[in-house]
Amino acid sequence: MLGDIDQAALDDAVEILRADGIDAHGVRCDVRKLDDVSHLADEAFRVFGEVHVVFNNAGIAYAGPIVETSHDDWRFVIDVDLWGPIHGVEAFLPRLIAQGGESHIVFTSSFAGLIPNVGLGPYCVAKYGVVALAETLAREVRPNGIGVSVLCPMIVETNLLANTERVRSEDYGPAHSDAQSVQQLASPPDDDSVLNVEDVARLTVEAILANRLYVLPHRAARDSIRRRFDRIDRTFDDQAAEGWEH
C-alpha cells in the first residue's frame, strides 16, 4: 500500500509495481493531515488484513538562516518532516500492537538529524525530532515484538527540491528558503558521496531484517558523528576541571 500527495506519481508507482507482479495499491495521502494517514491505515488493513512494515518516508527541504526563517517556513517544514512521522505512528502503531506478531516501523530522517548544518535550522530541528521519535519508540515497543529503524542518509538521488516546491501550498505563504542552498541539497555534485535510491533501499531492508535501529548509508558521516559525541563527552571533563561536582 503506497501513500502519496501527488496522485499522478502515486498512480505511476502503483503501475510499475503491478507490472512486476506485485499486488500494489495506492491512496492519496497528505501526511500533514492525521485523517489522511488514518485513512491510509484503514485501507492497508482492509486490503491486506495485516501490516508488517510501515515506512514513514515523506519529506521536504528548507534552507536559509534561522533569522530569515518565517513562522510559515517553520510550520511547513515541521508539518511535513516531523508531524508526518508522528501521524504515521498515531495511525498505525495501535493496530500493529493489536494484531500481534512481529512488525517494523521505519522512519526517514537525515544526516542532518544527527549533525546540525548551518542554514538548515528548521530541517535539522525536524529531522532531530524524527531520530528522537525513533529512538524512544524503539525502546517502548520492543516488548511488543515491533522493531524500529531510522534512516539517516547524507545525499541520495531523489526529487527533494521538486517535491518541496510542489507540496508547499498557499496556507504557508511565499517561501523564504534560499533556493540555491536547497538546490545544492537536492542536487549535489556528482561524486562518491551520492548514493542511488536502490542501494539505500537495499541497506534499509537489511536493517529491517536485522532489527537494526540506525541505518547509516554514508561511511563519510562516521567522523562527524564521532566528533559530535566526543565534544559532548569532553564537556563532563571540562566542567569537572572547573569544579563542578554533581
Regions found by a protein language model. Give the residues of each.
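The beta1-alpha1 cofactor-binding region of Rossmann-like NAD(H)/NADP(H)-dependent oxidoreductases
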Residues: Q7-A8, V27-H39, H71
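Residue(s) in the substrate-gating loop at a strand-loop-helix junction
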Residues: S110
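Conserved glycine-rich Rossmann-like NAD(P)H-binding loop of the short-chain dehydrogenase/reductase
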Residues: M1-D12
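Active-site helix of classical SDR
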Residues: V89, A126
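Substrate-binding pocket helix/loop in short-chain dehydrogenase/reductase
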Residues: P65-I66, D73-R75
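SDR active-site lid
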Residues: P143-V215
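Active-site-adjacent segment of SDR/Rossmann-fold oxidoreductases
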Residues: I115, T136-I146
